[in-house]
From Swiss-Prot:
Designated name of the protein: Protocadherin beta-6
Biological processes, Gene Ontology terms: cell-cell recognition; homophilic cell adhesion via plasma membrane adhesion molecules
Known function: Calcium-dependent cell-adhesion protein involved in cells self-recognition and non-self discrimination. Thereby, it is involved in the establishment and maintenance of specific neuronal connections in the brain.
Membrane topology: Single-pass type I membrane protein
Signal sequence segment: 1-28
Organism: Mus musculus (Mouse)
Gene3D superfamilies, sorted: Cadherins (2.60.40.60)
InterPro entries attached to this UniProt entry: Cadherin-like_dom (IPR002126), Cadherin-like_sf (IPR015919), Cadherin_C (IPR032455), Cadherin_CS (IPR020894), Cadherin_N (IPR013164), Protocadherin/Cadherin-CA (IPR050174)
Positions of glycan attachment: 169, 223, 225, 417, 566
Effect of residue 143 to P: Changed homophilic interaction
């Protein structure tokens, strides 16, 4: 049915109402925003919801959308906050070229109910382009007879910027013969002319080189330079003159390449080689043009395709130069004629591929039609099939809404293929078709169901970040978007658990990933809930419990608590030479932060100064002697012990133990727990020890008395003769017996030795302490 050709009175009323709506919309002022070009993406252009008079969130409720004219989508609308943001960095020169002002039109489309707002974005120019000359060098041939104040045409620099940021001034390097003046064309573009100040003398200087500089009006200004090379030639006193100063021509946009556009003609009154004229296109600041000129005949032909929709009018200057360097110019104005070479374009702004069967007059699509041609070539009509229960409703400015006539019945038909036909009124007519498939679906009455009520997943500590540890799966009995399930994590009940830093879930397939390496020593397990939510409206959801168990890895080496390793003061253990086999020298104490078999420690003696003298118990770290010490054993021993855990692979730590053999060191002897003592043998040994102790005490007492008397006598003799007793000097070995008879103890201490006859042990006990 064609909406523009309605015949019945009812359709006339619809058309009349549509025209009123179009007039109302056209009369409403568009909201205009302005930003500088090259503004970074993400820039906040405006709070659109506030400017349109809506509350925050109302744009999302009404399913607001933004539609751009053209292919560039520079803006994006955050419907939740109502903010209008830049989607990408805009380039004014790429979007508008030399057009000023640069205004981009777009529409804000709201559904439920449908409403349109005309909005414009103006891009202001910034000085982001430097002037550029078309050539790095310009050659001028000037006769030596040229009079001062003669003007020579120079090629203008091109600057993509506009306004004050475009080229504003030209300067030339200091010289004695020329200065440059800056002039304006009818379109406002600046161009330079070189003015002769002082007559040239070819015999004095046959060639000059000048630097021409173009400056724009930016702050700070940008510049571009080119070299002007001047050849001084013999006299040529007539410049070429064109038959017409202005050539106007019309060219259809579908003209083939190399088609003749126009022929220009110039003549030179000079004779000989000075009368030969060469034609060339004078490149101004407007950029390259799709034309080429024959330098001999003056024929201007088409070298590139024309497009009325892109550029409808060209203006260029033709320069005729004789062999003496004199030149003349004319202007060629070319009007491009439009032909019907563009089919209508249909742009879908909003599309709903499925409609609930209970939705009355549901909107299926909002679209716009456009045709860049002009006149009847750009006028369009739009229609759909007659037998379908859908209507096309024109809104404004070539916008249409495709909606259902009333509630649909899924049981009668669950799918519709709607073909939208758009035709222009040109000759011949060009047509565009677009087919939309609409599904009629049930309402959302089934919540997602997990395959398990709870999930347990295991991950080894020290895992790689982004490791896939498992998959959560749910199904939904609905169809279409109602069955599209998205997964998300619920905040944990334990506020101390930073779940967002531990795991993440793929919203589409439920795959769980560990975001960082787990540490069993810090966290052994944690729980959280996963939500599966379908895409219905309103959405239905369900939850499942997930428990992640961290498995311990052997990532901690044993740590030795004792003996402490200190390079400045190494640990030294004292061992009496009279120690029996199995004597406890020391005990190595170590811990492991891991758990299970990764924390089971074993001890091993790797290296010793005297192999076979010491041994270490593998499970408790006790270092004991394995035999009796002899006089041949060195006094200092160095033991290297290894502490190893039971992990895979095992980790270990080593400790160095220094053992010093000493004489007369009294320390309780700790027997091996395995040794079984014979009670009768202990009683015999006890009696023997008692006898030896009494004899030793008596001998020491007698020796002490004798020494005391000898010392007293020596003092008396010394006092009588010299008044002093000389003491021999020299080093006494530390292992020699003390001649005072006091042993290794100081003279100020004595100990009472007691043997218990009924204790059943041979250990000595130190009971009383006496001071002399």
């Amino acid at each position: 049915m064609e909406t523009t050709l309605a015949k019945t009175p009812e359709k006339r009323q619809v058309v009349f109402l549509a025209i009123l709506l179009l007039l109302w919309e056209a009369g409403s002022e568009a909201i205009r925003y302005s930003i500088p070009e090259e503004t970074e993406s993400g820039y906040l252009v405006a709070h659109l919801a506030k400017d349109l008079g809506f509350r925050v969130g109302e744009l999302a409720t009404r399913r607001a959308r933004i539609h751009h004219r053209g292919n560039k989508e520079l803006l994006q609308l955050d419907v939740e906050t109502g903010n209008l943001l830049l989607k990408e960095k805009p380039d004014r020169e790429a979007l508008c070229g030399a057009t000023e002002p640069c205004v981009l039109h777009f529409q804000i489309i709201l559904e439920n109910p449908v409403q349109f707002f005309q909005t414009e974005l103006q891009l202001t120019d910034i000085n982001d382009h430097s002037p550029e000359f078309p050539d790095t060098e310009m050659l001028l041939k000037i006769q030596e007879s040229t009079q001062p104040a003669t003007v020579f045409l120079l090629k203008a620099a091109q600057d993509s910027d506009i306004g004050s940021n475009a080229v504003q001034n030209y300067t030339v390097s200091p010289n004695l013969h020329f200065h440059v003046v800056t002039l304006s064309r009818s379109d406002g573009r600046k161009y330079p002319e070189l003015v002769l100040d002082r007559a040239l003398d070819r015999e004095e200087q046959p060639e000059l080189t000048l630097i021409l500089t173009a400056l724009d009006g930016g702050a700070p200004p940008k510049s571009g330079t080119t070299t002007v090379r001047i050849e001084v030639v013999d006299i040529n006193d007539n410049a070429p003159e064109f038959v017409q100063s202005l050539y106007s021509v019309e060219v259809p946009e579908n003209s083939p390449l190399d088609a003749l556009v126009v022929t220009v003609s110039a003549r030179d009154l000079d004779a000989g080689i000075h009368g030969n004229v060469a034609y060339s296109l004078f490149q101004g600041g407007g950029g390259p043009q799709p034309f080429v000129i024959d330098e001999i005949t003056g024929e201007i032909r088409l070298k590139g395709a024309l497009d009325f929709e892109a550029t409808s009018y060209y203006t260029m200057e033709i320069v005729a130069t004789d062999s003496g360097g004199l030149s003349g110019k004319c202007t060629v104005a070319i009007q491009v004629l439009d032909v019907n070479d563009n089919a209508p374009k249909l742009t879908i702004s909003s599309l709903t591929s499925s409609i609930p069967e209970n939705a009355p007059e549901a909107v299926v699509a909002v679209f716009s039609v456009s045709d860049p041609d002009s006149g009847d070539n750009g006028r369009m009509v739009c229609s759909i099939q007659n037998e379908l229960p859908f209507l096309l409703k024109p809104t404004f400015e070539n916008y249409y809404t495709l909606a259902a006539e009333g509630p649909l019945d899924r049981e009668i038909r669950e799918e519709y293929n709607i073909t939208i036909i758009v035709s222009d009124l040109g000759t011949p007519r060009l047509t565009t078709q677009h087919t939309i498939t609409v599904q009629v679906v049930d309402i959302n009455d089934n919540a997602p169901a997990f395959t398990q009520t709870s999930y347990t997943m295991f991950v080894h500590e020290n895992n790689n970040p982004a490791l896939h540890i498992g998959t959560i799966s749910a199904t939904d009995s609905d169809s279409g978007s109602n069955a599209h399930i998205t997964y998300s994590l619920l905040p944990p009940h334990d506020l101390q658990l930073s779940l967002a830093s531990l795991v993440s879930i793929n919203a589409d397939n439920g795959q769980l990933f560990a975001l960082r390496a787990m540490d069993y020593e810090a966290l052994q397990a944690f729980e959280f809930h996963v939500v599966a939510r379908d895409g219905g409206s309103p959405a239905l959801s369900s939850q499942a419990l997930v428990r992640v168990v961290v498995l311990d890895d052997n990532d901690n080496a044993p740590f030795i608590l004792y003996p402490m390793q200190n390079a400045s003061a190494p640990c030294t253990e004292l061992l009496p030479r009279a120690a029996e086999p199995g004597y406890l020298v020391t005990k190595v104490v170590a811990v492991d932060s891991d758990s299970g078999q990764n924390a089971w420690l074993s001890f091993q003696l790797l290296k010793a100064t005297e192999p076979g003298l010491f041994s270490v118990w593998a499970h408790n770290g006790e270092v004991r002697t394995t035999r009796l010490l002899s006089e041949r054993d060195v006094p200092k021993h160095r033991l290297l012990l290894l502490v190893k855990d039971n992990g895979e692979p095992p980790r270990s730590a080593s400790v160095t133990l220094h053992v010093l053999l000493v004489d007369g060191f009294s320390q309780p002897y700790l027997p091996l727990p395995e040794v079984q003592h014979d009670s009768s043998q202990d009683e015999d040994m006890l009696t023997l020890y008692l006898v030896i102790a009494l004899a030793s005490v008596s001998s020491l007492f007698l020796l002490s008395v004798l020494l005391f008397v000898g010392v007293r006598l020596c003092r008396r003799v010394r006092e009588a003769s010299l008044g002093a007793c000389s003491v021999p000097e020299g080093h006494f070995s530390g292992h020699l017996v003390d001649v005072s008879g006091m042993g290794t103890l100081s003279q100020s201490y004595q100990y009472e030795v007691c043997l218990s006859g009924d204790s059943g042990t041979t250990d000595f006990k130190f009971l009383n302490h006496y001071s002399q």
